């Protein structure tokens, strides 16, 4: 088997495997090196298994509250291990599908750990430590990222968790403190609360979900606190100590220090790129805050070397990584009409209860950039489908440029908003204005009508409020 390739990709996550498939489709001799599992964090320990667990928890919640619809049920019991097994089975099914697609498109998968030993030169060590050399005209780094630790608070796999342990608990802890309230922290807070765990959520910033619009963040916090989740913002966990029953945590906010004892602690303070032992230093690869620096076509400062996905910097999202994989391959293959990534068109989704979805600028960011804005907002409480479904918690908020009509941002909180945000993504991608969106017809009754009503409100033409 040949050891020279047009493209060699290091890392088989959503960025790497999609890049490999596209390269194979374009007729490029392609190899993919993966040291653990095809599908990366997303399919194995992130996006997919968390959604399976969240689905189970939400079903349990719906059954528990079915009496509101006149449906009587007995006591609801969740077999945690069966739920975990279901999530693992879903992941395995999808990773098997990735393996099939790579084979179908002529991609050679190499098991092992890769490092660069020169321009276009790669050495791969297999599980036995034996090394093999390869050459490629183009090398793509798609090595992803891993959970970040805090000084003095290191995961131990038993009492102090990362998402690895949180996805496959041996038993449900009675209490859980989550450090960090980004998408990962908020999703696990929602999950464990629905399963019956007492959850405390701690965030250093002034709001949970710090990257989201302030109104959306406030709505999620209000919902969480109503459910019994304790939320502390502008608070830092300064120390953890193991006890006979769990972990004693020292927390400090702007005015005081407090203590909390819990059975488990989950670190959800972001990720750090996997750049160690790749050989970047010897090649002089430029970094930006620890991430590999790239241009709009995913090229590094070293000719023939590219980086995509989490290792190339935020937003650390699977769909952004996959899109970069396609952009990278089509650029190096000379495909006409390839467009660079528009970061303002990258949707963000948080699958908590209530769900959160957004794209583009928040209100505060738009104002900080000096954009004149017109804002529309519509509540689920006035939406017929939401009322019929008993899902009245939430709203849709749209932000337009007051002068040009450009859609600057869309922010949604509530049931199924992660399935609706694509509508705003299409609108922004096609450069639709408020005027053109006004004339769209939305099916009735649907939750998506709240999208249209928010646009109408932004244009001072509200119909149902």
Annotate each language-model stretch with its function.
Residues 156-172, 259-336:
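FAD-site-proximal beta/loop scaffold in flavoenzymes
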Residues 11-16, 144, 180-185, 270, ...:
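Conserved phosphate-binding and hydrolysis motifs of nucleotide-dependent enzymes
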């Amino acid at each position: 088997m040949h050891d020279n390739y047009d493209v060699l990709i290091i890392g088989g996550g959503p960025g790497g495997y999609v890049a490999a498939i596209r390269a194979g489709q374009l007729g490029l001799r392609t190899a993919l090196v993966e040291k653990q599992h095809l599908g990366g964090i997303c399919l194995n320990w992130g996006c997919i298994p968390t959604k399976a667990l969240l689905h189970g928890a939400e079903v349990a919640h719906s059954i528990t509250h079915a009496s509101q619809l006149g449906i009587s049920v007995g006591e609801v019991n969740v077999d945690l291990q069966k739920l975990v097994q279901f999530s693992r089975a879903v992941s395995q099914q999808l990773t098997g599908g990735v393996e099939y697609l790579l084979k179908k498109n002529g991609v050679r998968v190499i098991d092992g750990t890769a490092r660069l030993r020169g321009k276009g030169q790669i050495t791969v060590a297999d599980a036995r430590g034996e090394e093999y050399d390869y050459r490629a005209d183009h090398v793509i780094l798609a090595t992803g990222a891993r959970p970040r630790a805090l000084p003095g608070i290191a995961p131990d796999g038993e009492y102090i968790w990362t998402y690895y342990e949180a996805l496959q608990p041996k038993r449900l802890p009675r209490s859980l403190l989550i450090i960090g309230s980004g998408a990962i922290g908020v999703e696990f807070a929602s999950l464990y609360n629905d399963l019956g765990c007492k959850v405390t959520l701690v965030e250093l910033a002034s709001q949970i979900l710090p990257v989201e619009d302030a109104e959306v963040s406030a709505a999620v916090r209000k919902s969480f606190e109503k459910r019994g989740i304790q939320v502390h913002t502008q608070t830092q966990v300064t120390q953890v100590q193991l006890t006979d029953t769990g972990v004693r945590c020292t927390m400090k906010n702007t005015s005081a220090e407090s203590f909390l004892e819990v059975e488990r602690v989950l670190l959800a303070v972001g990720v750090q790129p996997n750049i160690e032992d790749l050989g970047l230093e010897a090649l002089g690869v430029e970094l930006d805050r620890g991430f590999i620096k790239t241009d709009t076509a995913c090229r590094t400062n070293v000719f023939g070397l590219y980086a995509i996905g989490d290792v190339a910097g935020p937003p650390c999202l699977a769909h952004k990584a996959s899109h970069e994989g396609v952009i990278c391959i089509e650029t190096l293959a000379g495909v006409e009409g390839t467009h660079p990534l528009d970061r303002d068109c990258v949707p963000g989704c948080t699958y908590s209860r209530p769900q959160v979805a957004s794209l583009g600028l928040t209100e505060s960011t738009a104002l900080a950039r000096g954009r004149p804005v017109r804002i529309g907002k519509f509540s689920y409480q006035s939406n017929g489908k939401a009322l019929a479904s008993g899902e009245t918690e939430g709203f849709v908020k749209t932000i337009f440029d007051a002068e040009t009509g450009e859609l600057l941002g869309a922010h949604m909180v509530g049931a199924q908003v992660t399935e609706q945000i694509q509508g705003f993504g299409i609108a922004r991608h096609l450069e639709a204005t408020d005027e053109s969106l006004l004339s769209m017809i939305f099916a009735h009754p649907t939750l998506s009508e709240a999208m249209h009503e928010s646009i109408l409100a932004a244009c001072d033409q509200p119909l149902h409020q």
